[in-house]
């Protein structure tokens, strides 16, 4: 287990050392939330208000909160998948740089090497998507907060599941090409 943790730590350090990869993975959720809030929010709000009969009145705060929740849900779904692919580039770079050859002659099983890649992808993705989660909560708070603590915890749990799914998917696809 110590070997897996050492490989995980190595991959985490490489991810944070590569400023381009770090910047790209962190800026992606920020760009998406700005684009969603700028362009899609009005479209979503118009479609919500058009679907509500005239005899029913719903407060703007509730409609804005619902629209913000829809936008942040789609942002988190996209971000949790795309960020994991960006984070998992360490595995691809190791193959391109020849570092994998060094790992192959080391007295470490392939399972431990792949587990180290996978766990570091999960940890790094959770950090980046955690930042996106906080930004989304801030956007929800600004637009119309309606969630309680249990709702926030369920959304956090959903984010963790999405990161695990994205990490598994990106690891499988990276293994196919290695």
Question: Model-flagged regions — what are they?
Answer:
Residues 84-108:
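Transmembrane helix boundary and interhelical loop/hinge segments in multi-pass membrane proteins
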Residues 62-93, 158-171:
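Hydrophobic alpha-helical transmembrane segments of membrane proteins
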Residues 27, 100, 113-122:
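Short hydrophobic alpha-helical segments within the ABC transporter permease transmembrane module
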Residues 110, 118-177:
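Alpha-helical transmembrane segments and their short interhelical loops
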């Amino acid at each position: 287990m110590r070997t897996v943790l050492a490989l995980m730590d190595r991959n985490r350090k490489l991810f944070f050392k590569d400023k381009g990869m770090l910047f790209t993975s962190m800026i992606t959720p920020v760009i998406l939330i700005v684009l969603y809030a700028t362009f899609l929010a009005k479209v979503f709000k118009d479609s919500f208000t058009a679907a509500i009969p005239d005899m029913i009145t719903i407060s703007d705060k509730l409609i804005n909160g619902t629209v913000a929740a829809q936008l942040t849900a789609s942002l988190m779904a996209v971000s949790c998948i795309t960020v994991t692919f960006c984070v998992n580039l360490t595995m691809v770079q190791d193959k391109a740089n020849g570092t994998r050859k060094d790992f192959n002659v080391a007295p470490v099983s392939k399972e431990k090497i792949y587990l180290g890649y996978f766990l570091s992808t999960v940890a790094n993705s959770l950090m980046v998507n955690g930042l996106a989660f906080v930004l989304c909560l801030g956007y929800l708070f600004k637009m119309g907060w309606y969630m309680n603590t249990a709702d926030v915890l369920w959304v956090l749990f959903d984010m963790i599941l999405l990161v695990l799914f994205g990490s598994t998917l990106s690891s499988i696809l990276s293994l196919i090409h290695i």
